[in-house]
Design a protein with these regions (language model features):
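C-terminal alpha-helical interaction module
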Residues: 1-318
C-alpha cells in the first residue's frame, strides 16, 4: 500500500489521524473519455476515438471498482477490442504488482513490474494513489481514465458501431432513476464498507457500520418485488452494487467488521446477488481467491498475520 509523491513511490497507509479516524477516499485524477468520434466527453480533453485495439485495461480481480469495468467489457463484447492486464492480488510495499501468480496477466505494453510505473509513463511527476482500473491509450501513450464509473459509461456506448452490441446498461428512460440509485449506493454501501473497515476510531466505526446496514435494510425492502434495482432489466446500477455484495460475506463481514448481519441473512438481497452472479458472463469475472487473498493478505494494519480464511462456503446456484 502506498502512493506516488512527485513521481516518487512512498509506502504509506491511509492517513486517518488527520481525519479523526475517518477514511476519506481521494478523487481520481485522469478523467478523459473515449467517444465514437473522438470529440471531447463530459470531462477532460478530446482525441480519444473508439478504435479496436487502441486501448488497454489494467484491473485487479480483487477490486470492486475495477471489476465493474471488467464486467462491462465482457457484457459489451469488447474482449477482442480492448486488451487486458490483471495485477497480482497482493498489494504490499510496492502497491499493485505484476508478479507471477494464478490469474495474473502481465503488462503486455511495457513489461512493468509495478502498476505505479504505468502511471509514471503517463505523468512522470504524478502525485496520488495508484489505483485500478486504468484505461490506457496505446496511440498517445497516456492514461485515458482511472475512474471506474466513467469507464463503464464509455464501454456502454462508445464502441457500439465497432462491436454491433447495442445492449444499453444506462438507457435514457431510466437514467434519472439509475443516477439516484447510484447516489444512494455509492456513499452508503460501495464506499460504506470501506468507511467502516478502514476507520481507526470506535465511534466512527460504529456510526459507519450502522449507516451501512441501514442502507442494506432499505435495499432489502426495495427488492421485495423486484429482480433488478431499476426497471425490469440489468443496468449499471446493478453492476455497481453487485461488486460490493459479492464480496460481502467473503471479506467485508469479517475483515471489515461489517458483521451485524451476513448477506445471506437478507433473503431478497441474497437472491438478487445470486441472480446477477448467474447472469451470462458475470461469474467468470469473479475470482474469490483473488478477492480473499487481497483483502486479508494486503491490509497488514487490519490483519497483521495475513492469514486468509478458508470460508465461507456459499452456494451461488439459483
Amino acid at each position: 500500500m502506498g502512493l506516488l509523491q512527485d513521481g516518487k513511490w512512498v509506502d504509506k497507509w491511509y492517513d486517518t489521524k488527520s481525519t479523526g479516524g475517518k477514511f476519506v477516499r481521494t478523487v481520481t485524477q485522469f478523467r478523459n473519455w473515449i467517444t465514437p468520434d473522438g470529440q471531447v466527453g463530459p470531462t477532460g480533453t478530446g482525441g480519444f476515438k473508439a478504435e479496436s485495439g487502441r486501448y488497454h485495461l489494467y484491473i485487479s480481480l480483487a477490486c470492486p471498482w475495477a471489476s465493474r469495468t471488467l464486467m462491462m467489457r465482457k457484457l459489451k463484447d469488447l474482449e477482442d477490442h480492448i486488451s487486458l492486464s490483471v495485477v497480482h492480488p497482493l498489494m504490499l510495499e510496492n502497491g499493485w504488482t505484476f508478479e507471477d501468480g494464478p490469474g495474473v496477466i502481465k503488462d503486455s505494453l511495457f513489461n512493468s513490474d509495478y502498476l505505479y510505473q504505468v502511471y509514471l509513463k503517463a505523468d512522470p511527476t504524478y502525485s496520488g494513489r495508484v489505483t485500478v482500473p486504468v484505461l490506457w491509450d496505446k496511440k498517445t501513450n497516456t492514461i485515458v481514465s482511472n475512474e471506474s464509473a466513467e469507464i463503464m459509461r464509455m464501454f456502454n456506448t462508445a464502441f457500439n458501431d465497432i462491436t454491433g452490441n447495442q445492449d444499453d446498461y444506462y438507457p435514457a428512460d431510466l437514467q434519472a432513476e439509475i443516477n439516484a440509485m447510484n447516489d444512494f449506493v455509492y456513499p452508503n454501501i460501495n464506499n460504506g464498507v470501506y468507511k467502516a473497515g478502514f476507520s481507526t476510531n470506535q465511534a466512527v466505526y460504529e456510526k459507519e457500520v450502522k449507516n451501512l446496514f441501514a442502507a442494506l435494510d432499505k435495499l432489502e425492502e426495495h427488492l421485495v418485488d423486484k429482480d433488478y434495482l431499476v426497471g425490469n432489466q440489468l443496468t449499471e446500477a446493478d453492476l455497481r452494487l453487485f461488486t460490493t455484495l459479492v464480496r460481502f460475506d467473503p471479506v467485508y463481514f469479517g475483515h471489515f467488521k461489517c458483521n451485524i448481519k451476513s448477506l445471506v441473512d437478507y433473503p431478497n438481497l441474497w437472491d438478487y446477488t445470486k441472480r446477477i452472479y448467474n447472469h451470462a458472463g458475470i461469474a467468470e469475472t469473479v475470482d474469490f481467491n483473488h478477492i480473499k487473498q487481497h483483502y486479508y493478505g494486503s491490509h497488514k494494519t487490519i490483519n497483521p498475520t495475513g492469514i486468509v480464511p478458508v470460508g465461507p462456503d456459499l452456494d451461488w446456484t439459483l
